[in-house]
């Protein structure tokens, strides 16, 4: 039996202790006991997402896999060798289970009020064993093609991914997370097995538990568990080769009002340890400029040029970062011009002030502490694999951030960044 020792990290703002360790096989484990809840949420995060289609082989050659393969694997891993499915196994224990794939990660979750260790066994089985057959892959291709068509029929999804494709042409971000019709049809037994072997190893995964459980119980579970030897070498990531953006584009769909997206691509790198802080800085900047507390939003809203649909998306990783504003508007051309100009001249924006920053900070504080009442939110937002700050550092980060910090982040993104727009017009 191997002794498992957890390090404690106390977060004073939320009065919580997170227990962390790295097992002998490379798996990172983080625990947050919260006795005031009845449930437990468990989440395994695999550092493998839709952008991870380019890999460097041992001989130095770069191999490209079909777009959508991470999402395809997420679907297939629920299938057991006897053709039963692990989702049903979770249900038989009274647990809910789910999974989702993002640009950089795949997450597998369960929630339950009982049978914690049995659910942990199922979660372990889910991410450490793969059972593929040619027939089951063909069936899954049909299912995912239908899922892809559903997304293509959704105007908001179409707007987001079309804008992203024009921000990052020729990169994995140019294709939807589920893949394209062609790429889905190219996924086969061999490339699924190769990607499972490469990415689904303990050193590339983390487990997070939050809710009503005893740390000692989980500690004992891992001390008694037979851990298989595993490759503990980190998985190399390919950097994107950025091409020129497509500055403006449009299409027609069955929508009642035009939909506009403004995308800003950062062309400078962000260090991995700084990604979470940089994400917060950009959210603060664009909330001041375009959020509901800004004079710009209020004037546009009162004049009927925009409505409450205006939303902000911020993505920051060490390989790419972008900001996207989406909205319904009767005047997409005029608003695109106005927003582009405001972004380029952000240092002169009258909405960017110390007082306004304090208002946005207080709003973010409120949202954060409210979200701490949701185990699901915590389980999906906390990443035990983060090399820098995590969601529990948010209060400390907000207290430390100055207006100068926000402006510096704006310069980092905008000064030599690219801006595109995409419009969906009514057909």
Q: What role is predicted for each listed range?
A:
Residues 1-2, 85-234, 277, 286, ...:
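Charge-rich, well-structured scaffold segments of protease-associated domains
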Residues 1-85, 193-299, 409, 419-427:
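His/Glu-rich zincin catalytic helix
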